[in-house]
Amino acid sequence: MTTRLTRWLTTLDNFEAKMAQLPAVRRYGRLTRATGLVLEATGLQLPLGATCVIERQNGSETHEVESEVVGFNGQRLFLMPLEEVEGVLPGARVYAKNISAEGLQSGKQLPLGPALLGRVLDGSGKPLDGLPSPDTTETGALITPPFNPLQRTPIEHVLDTGVRPINALLTVGRGQRMGLFAGSGVGKSVLLGMMARYTRADVIVVGLIGERGREVKDFIENILGAEGRARSVVIAAPADVSPLLRMQGAAYATRIAEDFRDRGQHVLLIMDSLTRYAMAQREIALAIGEPPATKGYPPSVFAKLPALVERAGNGISGGGSITAFYTVLTEGDDQQDPIADSARAILDGHIVLSRRLAEAGHYPAIDIEASISRAMTALISEQHYARVRTFKQLLSSFQRNRDLVSVGAYAKGSDPMLDKAIALWPQLEGYLQQGIFERADWEASLQGLERIFPTVS
């Protein structure tokens, strides 16, 4: 009897403690309008980014639909749901989520830490791999304050990507932010998988944003592989989820990378794709009434891109780093697409994949002439730079005169540079190609370049 009474009193104490944490009054609003992607509610005063739940009737049961405040007009809140809203009725109750005992809303907290390694999560931190939720007590806010640029460590160390053309001809530094510009079907995902497997980094964070669901599974199981997945965290927000969840997925992947950087680790962040992130913001902005600008993209899109990209890079002196590769989809291989143009301006370099090379069976289909690494000159030696310059000159000379050479219209001796390019062309072309399962480290990449050009002037 005494044991039962003690247990009952303990349960009562726990219940009272939980009750004390609840706000005295739970306020709610009402749903007044649903137009396209946006729901309107009245009766609540909440800040931008606040999380709400909307009651949805399913027969005799009541379910909750999570949403976020994306705008307001007077007393009306504009809500963007994170899931399907079918079945929501006019006048449905809308509650604020994460309300403290004082009646204030706490910010959204998502799981962080080493327990995330090897896991596949969605943009809200929920598992997609069929395993339980990550066993971690570490959480963090989705958005962090801007990094003081004067406290960043300069880009001083070479990052070995394991891909020969990138290592030697487009050298990337640790903490650099690169764009991978490509149309559809030119080997973009395969190249990302090679970098994920072969890059010398402590942790890899992959954000698959707005891609087809089939491609997400294929990338994780076949392209990333067991070797890459063991040291990776994958955040997947495919094309069929809410645009808000797609944007949150990109921000969450970046936040995880920041967390590992703050722990002193060197992180490789792969974001596929930055264009889908911009398209998600376009959907949200147009839905709440923001006027379109260039090619239908509202001005807020071009403000969101640098805000996301600037979070990557080196940390403070002696700390970790985030080297980021963002894929940018070029519609019809148009390099002047507004998102491609904006990304080119805010990134530290770009790697362009060529459809012509891909159709010719040349992989990776990197267009060396159209690509550049802005940090390269500060990372390589004078001899290395001279070899790269000679390589590009010969490559450009051959490409300009390819048709003349092919039909036999070129007379040998007319152009010494072209003569040398023709003689070395098999070696140049072979150097630019690499098998999917072949790893070319930094030292081997330089040695291959030296074999083509033993002496440089």
Curated annotation (Swiss-Prot):
Spell out the coiled coil positions from the record: none
Q: Mention one GO molecular function.
A: identical protein binding
One of this protein's GO BP terms?
chemotaxis
Location(s) in or outside the cell: Cytoplasm
Q: Which GO terms describe its cellular component?
A: bacterial-type flagellum; bacterial-type flagellum secretion apparatus; cytoplasm; type III protein secretion system complex
CDD domains associated with the record: ATP-synt_flagellum-secretory_path_III_C, ATP-synt_flagellum-secretory_path_III_N, ATPase_flagellum-secretory_path_III
Q: Which SUPFAM superfamilies match?
A: P-loop containing nucleoside triphosphate hydrolases (SSF52540)
Q: Out of the domains of life, which is the source?
A: Bacteria
Q: Which UniProt keywords apply?
A: ATP synthesis, ATP-binding, Bacterial flagellum biogenesis, Bacterial flagellum protein export, Cytoplasm, Hydrogen ion transport, Ion transport, Nucleotide-binding, Protein transport, Translocase, Transport
Pfam short name (any one): T3SS_ATPase_C
List the EC numbers from the record: 7.1.2.2
Keyword Protein transport among record annotations: yes
Under InterPro entries, the record lists: AAA+_ATPase, ATPase_a/bsu_AS, ATPase_alpha/beta_chains, ATPase_F1/V1/A1_a/bsu_nucl-bd, ATPase_T3SS_FliI/YscN, FliI_clade1, P-loop_NTPase, T3SS_ATPase_C
> Per the record, what are the reactions this protein catalyses?
ATP + H2O + 4 H(+)(in) = ADP + phosphate + 5 H(+)(out)
Which family does the UniProt entry place this protein in?
Belongs to the ATPase alpha/beta chains family.
What's the stated role of this polypeptide?
Probable catalytic subunit of a protein translocase for flagellum-specific export, or a proton translocase involved in local circuits at the flagellum. May be involved in a specialized protein export pathway that proceeds without signal peptide cleavage.
Q: What is this protein called?
A: Flagellum-specific ATP synthase
Q: Which organism is it from?
A: Escherichia coli (strain K12)
- State the organism's lineage: Bacteria, Pseudomonadati, Pseudomonadota, Gammaproteobacteria, Enterobacterales
Q: Which gene encodes it?
A: fliI
